[in-house]
Amino acid sequence: MKRITINIITMFIAAAVISLTGTAEAAEKQQQSPANVTLTDQQKKEIEQLEAEILKKRKDVISKYVQYGILPKERGEHIKNHLDKHFEMMKQNGFVPKHHPHPHKFEKRH
């Protein structure tokens, strides 16, 4: 009797896990961003201003890392150049993030 009860509970748990997995995948598909989003000039200006502030702060942090000896000067300059290139790329794209066609299902980024 005890074994039958354990088997029934196991079947219910397995069924619940399988049904929740399908629900999660359906929710991911519904959350896709619209394909062609454009911002107004005013919106672009606001985002550009915010992104410029973020860029300055990030560069300040990198400078402090170099100053404190955590990063070598060459590496700090390389990172700052990369941040500048990224900012210019965002500016060219109208500050609208690009959609990546490959899904990130159940994988950790870090």
Curated annotation (Swiss-Prot):
The record's keywords, sorted A to Z, are:
Signal
Q: Which Pfam family is one of those matched by this entry?
A: DUF2680
Name the InterPro entries on file. Answer: DUF2680 (IPR024485)
Cleavable signal peptide: 1-23
The molecule here is called Uncharacterized protein YckD
